[in-house]
């Protein structure tokens, strides 16, 4: 079975492809880094009752086909979440820069200290 892939497409027509690297550690676990309760919530005493079960292993000690798929999808979800978080931060920074430029123009080029 081929590993899953994903493609993110913007309304403007740009796209970003996500592919699984099966031997990379992030694709060999069901415990994602961008899902579940935040570190802040866990430090406040929250118990993670929804933590995913570990992958099931076959008689040879290898993950079953469905467990491999779960692990690959967990890593893919982490990749997508990280990418979208970075995109949102870029958009926020771009908007802030535009707002700052507009404010400078409105005040005749001076900035508030």
UniProtKB/Swiss-Prot annotation:
Residue stretches of biased makeup (Polar residues): 104-113
Keywords assigned by UniProt, alphabetized: Activator, Chromosome, Nucleus, Telomere, Transcription, Transcription regulation, tRNA processing
Disordered: annotated span: 88-113
UniProt-annotated location(s): Nucleus; Chromosome, Telomere
InterPro entries: EKC/KEOPS_Gon7
Pfam family, one: Gon7
Quaternary structure annotation from Swiss-Prot or TrEMBL: Component of the EKC/KEOPS complex composed of at least BUD32, CGI121, GON7, KAE1 and PCC1; the whole complex dimerizes.
The protein's role, per its UniProt record: Component of the EKC/KEOPS complex that is required for the formation of a threonylcarbamoyl group on adenosine at position 37 (t(6)A37) in tRNAs that read codons beginning with adenine. The complex is probably involved in the transfer of the threonylcarbamoyl moiety of threonylcarbamoyl-AMP (TC-AMP) to the N6 group of A37. GON7 likely plays a supporting role to the catalytic subunit KAE1 in the complex. The EKC/KEOPS complex also promotes both telomere uncapping and telomere elongation. The complex is required for efficient recruitment of transcriptional coactivators.
Family: Belongs to the GON7 family.
Protein name from the UniProt record: EKC/KEOPS complex subunit GON7
Organism: Eremothecium gossypii (strain ATCC 10895 / CBS 109.51 / FGSC 9923 / NRRL Y-1056)
Gene assigned in the entry: GON7
